[in-house]
Amino acid sequence: MNALFASTARGLEELLKSELESLGAQSCAVVQGGVHFEGDNRLLYQSLLWSRLASRILLPLNEFKVHSDLDLYLGVQAIDWSTIFSIDKTFAVHFTGTNEDIRNSQYGALKVKDAIVDSFTRKTGQRPDVAKQQPDIRVNVFLQRDTASVALDLSGEGLHQRGYRDLAGLAPLKENLAAAIVSRSGWQNGTPMVDPMCGSGTLLIEAAMIASDRAPGLHRTHWGFNAWLKHDAELWHELTSEAQQRASQGLQATTSRFFGSDNDRRVIEIAKANARRAGVAELISFGVKDAAQLQNPLPEGPKGTVISNPPYGERLESEPALIALHNMLGRKMKSDFGGWQLSLFSASPELLSCLQLRAERQFKAKNGPLDCVQKNYQLADTQGESAGQIAEDFANRLRKNLRKLEKWAKQQGIECYRIYDADLPEYNVAVDRYGSWVVVQEYAPPKTIDAQKARQRLFDVINATLIVLELPSNRLVLKTRERQKGKNQYEKLAQKGDFLLMEEFGAKLWVNLTDYLDTGLFLDHRIARKMLGEMSRGKDFLNLFAYTGTASVHAGLGGARSTTTVDMSRTYLEWAEKNLRVNGLTGRQHRLIQADCLSWLHNGHEQFDVIFIDPPTFSNSKRMEESFDVQRDHLALMKDLKRLLRRGGTIMFSNNKRGFQMDIAGLTALGLNAKEITAQTQSQDFARNRQIHNCWLLTHAGEEK
């Protein structure tokens, strides 16, 4: 009787135990990462040939205490290696674990190698060679606390390497994990299986091998036991011959059929080649097809299982498309696959919620470093089953706001407006429309909110937005807003360089929805820009902290004699120049100046009739000589502005500080009058957020308007 150990992916241990018991294993004991079991030589070989779930099969050789590197050396040398492999064979050591004495796994592997080599040298005067690539013998050492376990790896390469897959798609599943997913899916042998995002076909191939009774190890040519001196070649030949016969009979007997599709033609060709090498090509129909074109291949029956490992995405910008994909998949399941089972394996349970289906069972497993979940669904025979509208209250509010705002925006002649602004506390986002595009901005949740719950709500919001606005996923841009500090205020988010031309009260304005946190157009200042256009006819106009120069455009189109646009950012000034040019505002009368606005203002001597200034609430940029706080410093700012303001002129001063208090007494002492016009500058789409900005008109004393 051999004491053996089968390793597997975390989360698959109980499944592996059941599989080993079905092969005849005895004394099975589950531990984290594998199963200890016992069996004779026949069972040893059968576990290697037939286990679909094991990663490796190990034959323990010795276990001993390690309190120093000498203990490790002596414990390994105590094994009679000459009874395990001969001097002409190569070997390699795989060492995992550390303790206080062996702090580096590479050092541990080196000590083990030395012990094995010295063992041979003392007995034979010769030493075996070490081979890092495909060694004849692989020695596995696991060190945990003060105990080392030494084993012979009978597998050689990992058992997931069945021998049928040369190439894979971008994110392949290991074959033993794929077999586990199939085993847990609820699929019944003899029924059809569909994978609408099959990639290189691993799930379908593993299922077809199960259906046709094909041993997963049948195609492997190299094993860790080939050079083992106790290898029973005759028994192995008997078992592989039996497996060949079973595979041949199973292929003829199975009634299961498999259907796979993917939108990548190259990957489908790889899947076909893999299926041919696995010996199951005649059971699987592969085709190039987008998941949106998915149809039931057997609409008249029998019922089967849809199984897949859909993409889950790592980048924020990919999430709207993935949410739309899962929502579409859920609708397809309900409309075309009534009575079937659905089983999806994903690293994102939040995306699975976008199916709008209720899972009957779920399992956890690791896919490499990723924590994953497999959810099984029973699809109702009748069409239209639903788990209810996702984020129904958010969706209803969105519909209500749209009914009110769409007509208003059309009448006003604006393409860009806010549809939703954190109206409901649990959905803390802003939704802005830019023509046929939508930007969803998530306000970063407080640290007290569970991150997974916040992510789930965001996914629900995106899903509902796509549905309510009937929007293609590639027209939704997702951003996360949080307090910007230092260089992050101006840092690029992406490098797409995609600009869209929008219209606002007759002005054409360029926006960029993807590359920066802001889009180039502050929607809440829309009416202020219109007022500036009306105030500027025949006047010299100054725009400070100008951003992308949108106020300068309105002033120019309103008939300003000249416009001067000042900002510290070259990027934004180039953007402002584009905005002016597309509106025909070119020539020397439209100046663009790159400068620290506070320094330029403090040192300036030119005079202007209309000045617009929208400073940051706080700034400490390295390119500014000192920090700026709008509440603390606004009076000093007004002193400089007054010097540049012609008699009869007007300053429009706006800022975004909540609770801002204008120093009226200080202004009076400076010889300035102030009139708050915040209410007049707030439009219908910001009616719920009265504190988004405050706005003032200032004039020389005695010139009230």
From Swiss-Prot:
Q: Which Gene3D superfamilies match?
A: 3.30.2130.30, RNA methyltransferase domain (HRMD) like, Vaccinia Virus protein VP39
First-level EC class: transferase
Keyword hit for S-adenosyl-L-methionine: yes
Q: CDD domains attached here? A: AdoMet_MTases (cd02440), THUMP_AdoMetMT (cd11715)
* Catalytic activity, EC: 2.1.1.173, 2.1.1.264
Where is this protein primarily located? Answer: cytoplasm
Q: Where is the THUMP domain?
A: 43-154
Q: Provide the disulphide bond pattern.
A: none
Provide the GO MF annotations for this entry. Answer: 23S rRNA (guanine(2445)-N(2))-methyltransferase activity; RNA binding; rRNA (guanine-N7-)-methyltransferase activity
SMART domains (UniProt xref): THUMP
**Catalytic reaction list:** guanosine(2445) in 23S rRNA + S-adenosyl-L-methionine = N(2)-methylguanosine(2445) in 23S rRNA + S-adenosyl-L-homocysteine + H(+); guanosine(2069) in 23S rRNA + S-adenosyl-L-methionine = N(2)-methylguanosine(2069) in 23S rRNA + S-adenosyl-L-homocysteine + H(+)
**What are the entry keywords?**
Cytoplasm, Methyltransferase, RNA-binding, rRNA processing, S-adenosyl-L-methionine, Transferase
The family annotation for this protein states: Belongs to the methyltransferase superfamily. RlmKL family.
Question: What protein am I looking at?
Answer: Ribosomal RNA large subunit methyltransferase K/L
Tell me what organism the protein belongs to.
Answer: Pectobacterium atrosepticum (strain SCRI 1043 / ATCC BAA-672)
